[in-house]
Amino acid sequence: MESALPAAGFLYWVGAGTVAYLALRISYSLFTALRVWGVGNEAGVGPGLGEWAVVTGGTDGIGKSYAEELAKRGMKVVLISRSQDKLDQVSSEIKEKFKVETRTIAVDFTLEDIYDKIKTGLAGLEIGILVNNVGMSYEYPEYFLDVPDLDNVIKKMININILSVCKMTQLVLPGMVERSKGAILNISSGSGMFPVPLLTIYSATKTFVDFFSQCLHEEYRSKGIFVQSVLPYFVATKLAKIRKPTLDKPTPETFVKSAIKTVGLQSRTNGYLIHVLMGWIISNLPSWIYLKIAMNMNKATRVHYLKKIKKN
C-alpha cells in the first residue's frame, strides 16, 4: 500500500503537467490567432519599407489584388506580366483609383533571357516589397507521362514557378539588404504543403517555393528582411478556373486583404482563416488517407474535363 502512494503521486504530477502544457499550447494558439487574424500588421506594410512594390503576374487574380492593396497603402507599383495591353489597362486603373505612380515591364516568364530587361526597368528604384506571384498550373489533372506536350510543360513550369522566384529575388534583395528593410512575398500554394498526385510538377514546384522562402527568411531576417511563403488553397481566379467565390474559395481581393495582415507576423501562412483550418485538418490526416482523397478527387476532375473536351 505504501509503495503505491509514491506511484500515485508521480502519476498525478505527470497528469497535471500534461494538462498545464496543453493549456499553455491552446492559450498560445488562441493568442497567436487573435494577433494575426484579429489585429494583424496593417501599419507595417507600406511605403515605410520602401517607395516601390514590384508584383509579377500583376494583371490578374491574386497578383492584381496585391498590387491594388499595396497601392491603396500609398506604395508606387511596378507591374510585370506578359501582355502590354493588360499591363497598360491595370496600370491606368491603379493610377486613377489610388493616385500613385505606376510602371510596367512586359516580359514572358516562360523564357530565360528576360531578366536583363527587368533589371534595367527596376534600376534606381527603392523597392520595399516584392511579390513573386506569377505562376502556371496544369490545364487539367493528368498522369505525368500523359501530360500533353510534356517537354514544353516541364520547361515552362520550372521557368515560371521556380526560376522567376530565384531571379527576381536575386535582382531585388541586394537593395533591401543595403537599406536593412524590405519584404518578399512568395506565392506558393496549398498544393506545395502536401503532395498532389496528377498535379505532380505543379505541386513539386510550389514545394520548392515554400522551402526556398523558409530558408531565405532564416538567412536574411537578421538583416531586416522579411520573407513569407503564402500557401493559399482555392481562390476564385482564372488560374484555378473558379468563377463563383464561396466561403472556402474567396475572391482574390478577399484573400489578399486577409493575407496582407500576416506580413511581418507569419513567415509561412495560408493567408486566409478558412484555409488555415483546411491546412490543419489535412496535416492531421494520415498521409495514405490524404493521398487517396487527393488522387480520387483529381481523377474525377480529369474524367470530367476529358468528357467535356470530347463533347466539344
Curated annotation (Swiss-Prot):
Q: Which parts of the sequence bind substrate?
A: S189
Which residue ranges run through the membrane? Answer: 4-24, 182-202, 271-291
Membrane-related topology note: Multi-pass membrane protein
Alphabetical UniProt keywords: Endoplasmic reticulum, Lipid biosynthesis, Lipid metabolism, Membrane, NADP, Oxidoreductase, Steroid biosynthesis, Transmembrane, Transmembrane helix
Residues annotated as the enzyme's active site: Y202
Q: Where is this motif: Di-lysine motif?
A: 308-312
GO molecular function of the protein, one example?
very-long-chain 3-oxoacyl-CoA reductase activity
**The keyword Cytoplasm is annotated on this UniProt entry:** no
CC per GO annotation: endoplasmic reticulum membrane
Q: Does the keyword Endoplasmic reticulum apply?
A: yes
Sites where the protein binds NADP(+): 50-79
Which GO annotations describe the biological process of this protein?
Answer: estrogen biosynthetic process; fatty acid biosynthetic process
Q: Which reaction does it catalyse?
A: a very-long-chain (3R)-3-hydroxyacyl-CoA + NADP(+) = a very-long-chain 3-oxoacyl-CoA + NADPH + H(+); 17beta-estradiol + NAD(+) = estrone + NADH + H(+); 17beta-estradiol + NADP(+) = estrone + NADPH + H(+); 3-oxooctadecanoyl-CoA + NADPH + H(+) = (3R)-hydroxyoctadecanoyl-CoA + NADP(+)
Q: In which pathway does it act?
A: Lipid metabolism; fatty acid biosynthesis; Steroid biosynthesis; estrogen biosynthesis
Coarse class of the protein's main subcellular location: endoplasmic reticulum
Entry-linked InterPro entries: NAD(P)-bd_dom_sf, Sc_DH/Rdtase_CS, SDR_fam, VLCFA-Steroid_DH
Q: What is known of its domains?
A: The di-lysine motif confers endoplasmic reticulum localization for type I membrane proteins.
PANTHER family for this protein: RH59310P (PTHR43899), VERY-LONG-CHAIN 3-OXOACYL-COA REDUCTASE (PTHR43899:SF14)
Q: Which family does it belong to?
A: Belongs to the short-chain dehydrogenases/reductases (SDR) family. 17-beta-HSD 3 subfamily.
According to its UniProt entry, what is the function of this protein?
Catalyzes the second of the four reactions of the long-chain fatty acids elongation cycle. This endoplasmic reticulum-bound enzymatic process, allows the addition of two carbons to the chain of long- and very long-chain fatty acids/VLCFAs per cycle. This enzyme has a 3-ketoacyl-CoA reductase activity, reducing 3-ketoacyl-CoA to 3-hydroxyacyl-CoA, within each cycle of fatty acid elongation. Thereby, it may participate in the production of VLCFAs of different chain lengths that are involved in multiple biological processes as precursors of membrane lipids and lipid mediators.
Annotated protein name in UniProt: Very-long-chain 3-oxoacyl-CoA reductase
